[in-house]
Amino acid sequence: MLDLRKDPLVRPPHTGRRLAVAFCSLAVLLAPVAAHASAPAPAGQRGATVSAGTGLAQEKRLKSWGNNRSGQLGDGTWTDFRTTATTVLGLTSAEVVKIAAGGGGAANGHGLALLTDRTVQSWGANGSGQLGDGSVFSHNAPGQVVNLSDARDIAAGGWHSLALRDDGTVVAWGRNNYGQLGNGTHNDSSVPVRVEGLDKVTAVAAGLHHSLALREDGTVWAWGHNANGQLGDGTSAGRNVPAPVNGLTGVTRIAAGCDHNLALTGQPGDGADPTGGNAVKAWGHNATGQLGDNSTVNRYTPVDTQGIWLGGVAHIAAGCRHSLAVTDSDHKLKAWGQNTSGQLGDGTTDHRITPVPVPGLKGVQLLAGGREHTVALLGDGAVRSWGANGSGQLGNGTTTESSTPVTTLTALTGVDKIAAPVGGDFTFAN
């Protein structure tokens, strides 16, 4: 039998590396499976390390950079951090459908990858069972989530994870102190459990201690922590089963920050395109203006983000305390909320309570927000990032923060997916 205490890919719980820092720090398969602890990854799967400003390795693989104190980079090491891209062991780019990053502090982070065979791989911190492998041992290389074989979407929270199944139901695993697993209890689970009362779900999202689901009818359902109104039900009472967010219909996209949320909808509103385009709705924590409603007042039901409509909105994303949107007509970026480390990318460190443009970026296709950094994928496959960089999460070979975008990976690398944890300081690209 494998001795987990001696395996280099496995870290037992309760080591100093696993200290959970709850500062507002935060985007499946029924078969006999080989869990994380089965064996080290085969030789030759490590791949080549990529330096800043270079293309991906010839054999394209999932890449990671930034904090690695809990093995969240998945490269088979416990190296504290990496300032340039390394390779996640054993996962080729071609087999990865979606990636998700979770975490709630410098010493806590985990990753998820949805594969073409509909299974989910996980790695990193696991003190609350957030890897879903039936253990609470951290792992620095991917292993399979157990008892799920039909995933179509994934999300990673601070210490918990979610997966949407083919039948439209949702499963969750990991920490459950606030009911964020949605199964009617407050008991942690190291294996997937079904979220109660949800069907016909099309997408999921996870905050630091809460969860969201978008249903086919355009409604949004929420559960978990609610001290700042992040469940959007008009109260501050937590819920361990899902409940609808008040007044939201026609929603097409959702995003979760540490304690706030965004929804993209075609509903008219003060922040919507007067020509009939869509609107961004926001609710929850608002101390640094992350709701974009020209205030710093927490909102317990959705409000309109102001001045975002120019050309419509194509994509939304949330960091811990900041928010992001890409305009539909010209794929330019707007940002608002906390800007302590320059994560808004506007060349300042001033918080913004309404959206401001990020200069110098065109053709933005996807966005990801971390605790205090932001990542953008451009149409040519290039990755740009900005904000905090103390753990190398910008991937440009330094630990110097930047309030304007810097180059992480050059154009034409074939990248089409990015992820960052709303409560953490690392990044994935595939």
Regions found by a protein language model. Give the residues of each.
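Eukaryote-biased RCC1-like beta-propeller repeat architecture
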Residues: 2-3, 8, 12-430
